[in-house]
Amino acid sequence: MVRIRLARGGHKKTPFYHIVITDSRSARDGRFIERVGFFSPIKFSNRTGLGLRVNLERVKYWLYKGASPSDRVLKLIKNL
């Protein structure tokens, strides 16, 4: 089953997440099919708001193909 989920990056105590298309059997930060965006939950002093960038065209394509988003990714996409 193909999933749309977050893969963690960044440093200790400063998380950064890639929004990836992956097989559900792969590890959280393991192999992925395609990277479709990123999410940074930490506010930085030099920019306003949270960092979120998503290629909605590719997300719609994968949803059409039957990919299921994780709860967190679904919440992020709905807020766009």
From Swiss-Prot:
Pfam families: Ribosomal_S16. GO terms for biological process: translation. PANTHER family: 30S RIBOSOMAL PROTEIN S16 (PTHR12919), SMALL RIBOSOMAL SUBUNIT PROTEIN BS16M (PTHR12919:SF20). Belongs to the bacterial ribosomal protein bS16 family. GO terms for cellular component: cytoplasm; small ribosomal subunit. GO terms for molecular function: structural constituent of ribosome. This is Small ribosomal subunit protein bS16. Keywords: Ribonucleoprotein, Ribosomal protein. InterPro entries: Ribosomal_bS16, Ribosomal_bS16_dom_sf. The gene is rpsP.
